[in-house]
Amino acid sequence: MDKKWWKEAVVYQIYPRSFMDSNGDGIGDLNGITSRLDYLKDLGVDVIWLSPVYQSPNDDNGYDISDYRAIMQEFGTMEDFDRMLSEMHKRGIRLVMDLVVNHTSDEHKWFVESRKSKDNPYRDYYIWRDAKEGKEPNNWGSCFSGSPWKYDPQTEMYYLHLFSTKQPDLNWENPAVRKEVFDMMNWWCEKGIDGFRMDVISMISKPEGLPDGKIPEGGLYGDSGCVNGPHVHEYLQEMNREVLSKYDLMTVGECAGVTIEEAEKYASADGKELSMVFQFELVDLASGTYGKWTDKRVPLKDFKRVMTAWQTELEGKAWNSLFLGNHDQPRCLSRFGDDSPEYRVVSAKMLATCLHMMQGTPYVYQGDELGMKNVPFHDLSEFRDIESINAFHELTGAGKVAPDDMMRYLNLRGRDNARTPMQWDDTASAGFTTGTPWIKVGPDYETVNAKNEMADPDSVYNYYKKLIHLRKEKDIMVYGTYELLDPEDEALYVYTRTLGDQKLLVMCNFTKEEQEYTVPETFAGAEVLISNYPQDGAAAGVRKLRAYEAVVLETK
């Protein structure tokens, strides 16, 4: 059993724009985060993953970086950052920074130079191509709708941007680019940060020759083939040699489209690349003709199949990261649970139990520990997310989706659901700001807020606190092997964890109907470790699991 601090940690993701505003401008900031560190210490988390706070024109909420060694003015100064880091470390909390190096902002000095002329020293920092028969160099589609090629009249060539037009892709084939990135990473490590979460890192290596891609049925553009490109592992191993191996870091790669076999390469136990990856097979379930824009729910059998494959097939080979939501996903409670007032609390606790009892490093997205849910958006003007707004115009404009249907899809699946302000108390704007918040506040903030949750011993917050505390006490939660029971059951998710002669049985009812379950004989005499309902009576035999009930039994 190869023990590591990051395997035993619980990570809390902060989306800084929406966490806490200290100066009344309606935008969360670094001093706001510092002011709330005692809350996170009380919750018990070990690591904070901070979404980008670098200098940025903010075309894509900070994922378009114009200076990697400066802080976005809306968020504060480098002095504010240094103080925040110091205060985290005083409380025993580590900091993982978001690293965005597939692309920069078009306002980064490298790109400003690159576009000036074809012989500029920075020209090959980016990917430039001539037109093909008067059109884009190939048929690829951008991740944010439309073509990923933008014509630049200055040099009469196109540059590649897999995301927005203001996010030109870096040319990782150029050794000078890699050196710049590694130097910058070392600079942050010397400041004392504890790791990196690497944005779309599986896309940094482009296919040789940038050929046309296959157009999916009903689609408008070809697949770029940039996921898990030909040199991605080479580049990450070089990054590991030049930066990561010199420090005691936690590294996680955001790897959309990654298979279990690929994940083994990215996060192999031999430590040559990353600590772990984010896989999106679970959150990409129930996609439709237009990708995520659908109202389909994820069938529990599919949920179990995906979670189980990653649990069992990476066992002993690589490490899992466990998450049901983040800043790019709708609220996990609304997506996988039941956010109605009647079941909000029990189903939020059930989802947390199901996730935190698995093998891997759990991630808590800000507000999930309060049972925050999707927020109703009634008009396109209320959205702030470039992805949602672009998708609305593209799909309704092409006559593919009716506007009312598209609004429903945006409400169910849009990224702004996770980006509404953190609900601290029942005062105006949920205590997030004394000014006007940059995006609307959830309408339920008067009841669902941190102040209420902390005061109520039976709250979602205090349940998360228990789960996080248990992980520190119970090696079996971290290192035990996983086995799924009853894979075909469409209502219950039941699995075991085993470490030596210790065993846990995790039972989760994913429905609001009562479900019967026969507890295996091996758990006769077992005790309840944690549950989201009061428990009585014997552990073994037939149990009736109430609406969204979760029970964990432990053999001694």
Model segments located where?
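Active-site and adjacent substrate-binding regions of carbohydrate-active enzymes
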Residues: 1-556
